[in-house]
């Protein structure tokens, strides 16, 4: 169990950049390790800091999961093109939060099996993944005003492109996050319900009173020209909206749709193992009681499939990407349509 913040030692991670210096810096967050391959080694997490004068600080993160490529790619590109003269304040760019997972192309770290987005607030005396989480919680988040964490579905999910905020106790914090999610300019904005939010990066940020916007921008363990274009436009909009970069918001061609996930019944999870057939395409409307998926027994033929039905009206916001499914896997996510924002 993690110690209370007052009992914890300083993070073992050190930065090769000066977060207070004006200009553009590219460097690393260095986490010491010792293993069979490197007795005196380090996990090297790339970081870029772009700063000019006084102003807000935005923390932009990708690679929280290593098989979600839109955020990784878009932030790598941003780190090469964003100039100090473009910025009023400070932009901290970490394209690959969980660098070991990213280099392995896996959701979790090959070093300790850690899922970074289930490891917060972290522990400076814990595993590699817990130490990374701790550094973000106690070093980077406190120096930030707004945080954008870029996700997609990875290898096992495909998700409509959206920016998300959460229901919060602080109404003003919730309002500002929702405005940022809408300003991101993805085809969808959503008020997202998390199945277990306790150890998420989202929660660690929100508990510090910071503005947090998350995204889901595709999936299948790849990226597309369309998903990258949405991601890059959204990052630019985020920086404009929160006053770090001057400019106008880039508005999508089609009206943005605002969705809500009110509770856990939005998630349709399999009670069987077998072959998955989705009967509804991603983004299509569904009605309560409609068959949205079938699971076939793969151990014999001539057996009728098990049907899964929608528990609410809405749109298919996410779906399992592989055709094989195990008991407990999320088959689909259905979100309710609140309004068209066009």
From Swiss-Prot:
GO terms for molecular function: hydrolase activity, acting on carbon-nitrogen (but not peptide) bonds, in linear amides; hydrolase activity, acting on ester bonds; metal ion binding. It comes from the Bacteria. Its cofactor is Zn(2+). One of its GO terms (cellular component) is cytoplasm. Disruption phenotype: Cells lacking this gene are unable to grow on ectoine as carbon and nitrogen sources and accumulate N-alpha-acetyl-L-2,4-diaminobutyrate (N-alpha-Ac-DABA). It holds the Pfam family AstE_AspA_cat. Binds 1 zinc ion per subunit. Its EC number is 3.5.1.125. InterPro entries: AstE_AspA_cat (IPR055438), DoeB (IPR014336), N-alpha-Ac-DABA-like (IPR043795), N-alpha-Ac-DABA_deacetylase (IPR053138). Residues 103-124 are annotated as: Disordered. It is an enzyme of class 3 (hydrolase). GO terms for biological process: ectoine catabolic process. Involved in the degradation of ectoine, which allows H.elongata to utilize ectoine as both a carbon and a nitrogen source for growth. PANTHER family: BLL3975 PROTEIN (PTHR37326:SF1). This is N-alpha-acetyl-L-2,4-diaminobutyric acid deacetylase. The gene is doeB.
